Amino acid sequence: MTAEKITQGTEGLNVPNEPIIPFIIGDGIGPDIWKAASRVIDAAVEKAYNGEKRIEWKEVLAGQKAFDTTGEWLPQETLDTIKEYLIAVKGPLTTPIGGGIRSLNVALRQELDLFTCLRPVRWFKGVPSPVKRPQDVDMVIFRENTEDIYAGIEFKEGTTEVKKVIDFLQNEMGATNIRFPETSGIGIKPVSKEGTERLVRAAIQYAIDNNRKSVTLVHKGNIMKFTEGSFKQWGYDLALTEFGDQVFTWQQYDEIVEKEGRDAANVAQEKAEKEGKIIIKDSIADIFLQQILTRPAEHDVVATMNLNGDYISDALAAQVGGIGIAPGANINYETGHAIFEATHGTAPKYAGLNKVNPSSVILSSVLMLEHLGWQEAADKITDSIEDTIASKVVTYDFARLMDGAEEVSTSAFADELIKNLK
């Protein structure tokens, strides 16, 4: 068997039996969790395919290790390698302290145009949770990754640049509601039709491919009408234009209410649901954040902008056990580029202690296996995590909250997962 690159074809990824996949080990606890995760992934692939498939791991540098080795936090060679090999896995990265150096995670997303942050959130039986019914949470978040106020277009208070921006806004654009112009910093919030459409397209296609029931467009369009409000409208428009016979939208529902009454609209939606159509709906962000606590079962796939998605993803993760067990991926569904990553930080005080929970990067690797079409290996890991947590053999973060738990190290937890692969 010869290791080969994954390539992008007209119908999606072309995945060889021995793909070369770059990995970034990560800072802080990165080496601990990656060592555990890679053993679990390799064991699951071996068990699923009896040696007919395997992954050839290729280390690339980013973060502290890259800086110590090359003097750069994110070497161009790393970006070029990921561009060439399409798929990568990464541990948590330190954001360098100091002005002018952006988050390495954000830099990777922007340089590779990874426009979707994919965050599936579900509960594993036995995981400690602060809510009464964590089992009702089963959502997949599609967070737009390249626009919104996270685009990094900011001007610091007191600088020549911000004075120019404020002067332009006040004198050229007639903006009279900058309350304290002399002491304000300014941030720009770009939201485009193209950026919205490619995100919503990916979310709806995911819902169709995975037999989900609905896609909720989450926004603050009631306040920010030409950015978040446009996101909502562009999302609805795309749903009907590109997926017309496969979806039923709340805007269609409202039109039926206006013409034929609410009873007729309810009948139309029930008919669409029975036919397996995806219901496209929307929710204002603050109401949505209430509903994920009070009635989470009403939401399935979620498409939202960058800032909303950041809040929502971590708020949902807290309901099912925290970011230690939350997977994440950053994907460009058009070019095939994707990075699968731990969603938590570097936790430097635990570095090298062989103590922390490796589940986030393991479950992110499950997403990677699913993305590659290696569902059998992915399912084996998911089932093993379920069985292992149910048996109460867990790392310290869960053990301290579970009665009768056996606390084990990072490496011992990986051993248990490998033992429970079926």
UniProtKB/Swiss-Prot annotation:
Pfam families associated with the record: Iso_dh
Query: Would the keyword Magnesium turn up in this protein's UniProt record?
Result: yes
Q: Which residues bind NADP(+) per the record? A: 94, 344-350, 357, 396, 400
Swiss-Prot/TrEMBL keywords: Glyoxylate bypass, Magnesium, Manganese, Metal-binding, NADP, Oxidoreductase, Tricarboxylic acid cycle
| Residues that bind Mg(2+) | 310
Q: Which cofactor does it need?
A: Mg(2+); Mn(2+)
Which reaction(s) does the protein catalyse, per the Swiss-Prot or TrEMBL entry? D-threo-isocitrate + NADP(+) = 2-oxoglutarate + CO2 + NADPH
Q: Name one GO biological process term.
A: tricarboxylic acid cycle
InterPro entries from the UniProt entry: IsoCit/isopropylmalate_DH_CS (IPR019818), Isocitrate_DH_NADP_dimer_prok (IPR004439), IsoPropMal-DH-like_dom (IPR024084)
| Enzyme Commission no | 1.1.1.42
Q: Which SUPFAM superfamilies match?
A: Isocitrate/Isopropylmalate dehydrogenase-like
One MF annotation (Gene Ontology) recorded for this entry: magnesium ion binding
**Under which main EC class is this enzyme filed?**
oxidoreductase
Coiled coil stretches, renumbered: none
Q: Which annotated residues bind D-threo-isocitrate?
A: 103, 105, 109, 119, 143
The similarity comment for this entry is:
Belongs to the isocitrate and isopropylmalate dehydrogenases family.
Q: Known PANTHER family for this protein? A: ISOCITRATE DEHYDROGENASE [NADP]
* The protein, known as: Isocitrate dehydrogenase [NADP]
Name the gene behind this protein: icd
